[in-house]
Structure formats: structure tokens, C-alpha cells
Amino acid sequence: MSATTAHAPGDGPLCLVTGATGYIGGRLVPELLAAGYRVRCMARSPGRLHDHPWIGQVEVAHADVTDAAAVRRGIEGVEVAYYLIHALGTGEDFAAIDRRAASVFAAAAKDAGVRRIVYLGGLGPAGDGRLSEHLRSRGEVGEILLASGVPAAVLRAAVVIGSGSASFEMMRYLSERLPVMIAPRWVRTRIQPIAVRDALRYLTGCAALPRDVNRTFDIGGPEVLTYEEMMHRYAAVAGLPRRVVIPVPVLTPGLSSLWVGLVTPVPGPLARPLVESLRHEVVCHEHDIARYVPDPPEGLIGFDEAIRLALKRIRNADFATRWSSVSAPREPSDPLPTDPDWAGGSLHTDVRESEVAASPETLWRVIEGIGGEHGWYSWPLAWAVRGRLDRLVGGVGLRRGRRDPYRLRVGDSLDFWRVEELLPGTLLRLRAEMRLPGRAWLELSVEERQGRTWYRQRALFHPRGLLGQLYWWAVRPFHGIVFGGMQRNVRRAAERAAAPGRP
């Protein structure tokens, strides 16, 4: 029996999404809206929701899930309640907090007459008394919700593949930063990962489950892989050389989490329980969910395609775009503005700005005239040497110049840059076409604040593998000379052009 139900926009049952500022919650909301459901988001910090493109289409309830009175107010009138909260990474006794929060939520849902609870937990071996505290806590929360008296669907997933997922980000950083890795035995553990868009499709479909369904469902993608195989496959899709992984038996979960903390930016309190859980085989034992939420005709998304989707924004150079265009629809595998700073892959930046004693129009003329015969307003020798080195390794070098000495358009070559985005009078974004172990952009912009003109300059670099990381840190000491000099000289050029007596 299929649980898929279509509703007219905004005409469906009211769904409550807890954890809407989290990884899954923030991506589930637009899926529910697209399916015609009305949505209320419950958040401890509602201000963190404001950058989402869907904020104007939802209700917002301010509540801490351990506050019974606030939860009762937030859940009133709700038909389907999504419980997407866990205390992992708080550094406290997260299992006790999870039990208390789930009990409060379950009682409030029953008192409010909620028709369905949907929870996303962790996949683990059944009946294993040696479960990690993380997986054991997820299981306890599921049991509390199943015993609530409200029909519950407890979905159990292993690693969710998508930009922003903590498990995926840990694998991404390990794969990108370590060409050779001495690894613990858990790299040989079997895992059944699932693409985030497939997980969201199951979660959305559970809103229409029959009332008599009160059970767990294992959800996973079409492949079972070891962690080592996942790292090798990630490297292949990302265009990295094959990784060398040497398993050793001596690294305990505690030591492994310390090592992960050194290599990746994933916080230690979050990395440790994730690492501890990797010693367990996490493979689906059934696929009963397909009886209610059928698999798509083309099948579930495979691991390689899930990685490609997660890396799509990087490949399309969308790293440089800002969150000012949050109204644009985004894919579930894309990063979101509420994702942690460490999510989405490495992005190094050099940001400088200064007030300019000139009109915005005068400053823009200087910016649009940069490069070619006008130069780069910075240490000329450094640019010349970088251009010569680029030519020596088969790059384009500095000799391309520019099409027009004063005007630019999107697609123009500009020495070893390409004009990627141009908003006349406001923004010039250049993408580097020099040979680099990564991708680089240079963004020059004009801002007017309270009648004053400001120049903002931002250099961005997305490293490719360990060599890319080493390259950034090797050239970083020179940024003060190159980019600092550019910022000062662009400002001075605009102020000279604005001086009295200049044409």
C-alpha cells in the first residue's frame, strides 16, 4: 500500500518539524511544502531560521524540547510531528538529555492528539549489547516514541550522503586531506549509506502512513561498502589520486577521534561518538518502507551519484556565491546557510575592506578597469612571476590581457582570470584559470553605507587534496603584500580620480 499522497499547495495537514535548524530538518521543510503540507518549525533559536528561503511559508514555534509547557504550545493542532533532535556533540550526558527530551515530546504529542510521529534514528545491529552510546541512545529514543501511544515511524539510517551531514563531512575531509592514512580496523566495517534526497523522500512519505503502522524501518541506498571503499570512491569522484589506507589494530575509538579531530574540522565532541559507532556493521535487514513509500522508477541513488550531487556546487563554482540570494531553490544535497562552518568542504578566504573617499561610480570605474595594461594595483613583480610560472607549467599566464581597456562582460578573459559574474556598479567576480591545486576566485565589490563608499575585496580558495592545503598555507604569508597592497592601491586610485581638478 503506497503512503504517497498529493495535496494542493498549503492545503495539507499541519506538520511540525523539530530540529529545523539542523541538517535533516532544514532540508525536510521545503520537501513537505512542495508536497502540499503546512509546516510549523519548532526551534530553540528561531533567529537561525531567518536565512532559509522558505521562512515566509512556515509557522515558527519557540521551544526547547525539554520544556514541557513550551512543547505543548508548539505541538497544538499538529497532525504529523517530525522528531529530528538529538543532543550529540553537546559535550554533556547526551543520552540522558535525549531520553528526557523524547519523553517530553511523546507525552505532548499524545495529549495534543497528534496522528503520527516520524523519527530518523541510527541503523545498528539488533540485540548487540556492545552498541556505542550514540547508537544506543538513538535506539532508546525510537523505543520511547514507539511506546508513546501515538503511531510512530522510526526510520533507521547509516551514513547520510550530502553536504553538511556530519558523517559525510568527516569522510570528505579524511579523503581529501590524507593521501596515505594509517587507519583503525573500523575502516573495514560494512556500511549501507543513503543519499540525503532518498532519506528525505522516505521521511516525507511517512506523513501519509496508515494509522496502524507503528514500527521501525531500515532505510539505505543500493550499495553496501566498507568505510575504506567509501573513501576510495569519494577520491575517484572528486578527481583525487587513489588513497592508500593501512588498517592497524591498535587505534582505540578514543585515539581515533583525537586523530580525526586533528585532521578534520569536525568538532571533537561530535567526532568521537561518530567514530565509536563505526565499529558496528550498519546494514539494512529489511526494505519494508518500499511497501508504503515506493522506490522511484529509476531506483535509489547510488553512492557515486550521491557524492557527485554533494560536490555539484563546488564543480559549478557556486562556492563563491553569497547567501544573499536565499530565495533561489536549492537541492537537498547542497549546503544551507544554517550548516556549521566546517560543513561544505574547505574554503579559505582573505577578506579586506576599507572606506573610500570617492563616489561609488568612481570606485567602480577603477574596479572595472583592473588588469591588462592597468595592472593589478599590487606588487607587479609578484604578478609577473606568478604569470611566468603559470606559463612554464602549461597555464595561460598573464599575456592574455583584456578585450576592452575599460569595460568587462561575463565570460571575458582577464589575464589569468575569467569574468564569472558582473553586476555593474556593484560586483566583479573573477575565477582563476591559472594552474592551481584547487579552485580560486577574486571578488571586488562596491557598497554604499549611510552615504559613504566602501570597497570590499575577497579572495577565495577551495583546495584540492593535501597539495591544495599546503599551497594555501605556503602563499598565505604573502597575502598581506599582494592582496593588502591591492586593497590600498585600488582605494588610492579611486580617491585620486575623485580629487578636484581631475576630469
Predicted regions and their residues:
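Conserved glycine-rich Rossmann-like NAD(P)H-binding loop of the short-chain dehydrogenase/reductase
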Residues: 37-44
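Glycine-rich portal/gate segments that line the openings of hydrophobic small-molecule binding cavities
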Residues: 347-348, 355-364, 368-437, 448-450, ...
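NAD(P)H-binding glycine-rich loop region in Rossmannoid oxidoreductase-like domains
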Residues: 47-112, 122-130
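N-terminal Rossmann NAD(P)H-binding glycine-rich loop of SDR-like oxidoreductase domains
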Residues: 8-37
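SDR active-site strand-loop-helix element
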Residues: 18, 42, 84, 117-123, ...
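Beta-strand/loop substructures that line and gate deep hydrophobic ligand-binding cavities in soluble
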Residues: 432-480, 490
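Oxidoreductase cofactor-interface core, primarily capturing Rossmann-like NAD(P)-dependent enzymes
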Residues: 28, 35, 127-240, 258-266
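Mid/C-terminal beta-alpha module of Rossmann-like enzyme folds, strongest
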Residues: 3-9, 205-273, 281-352
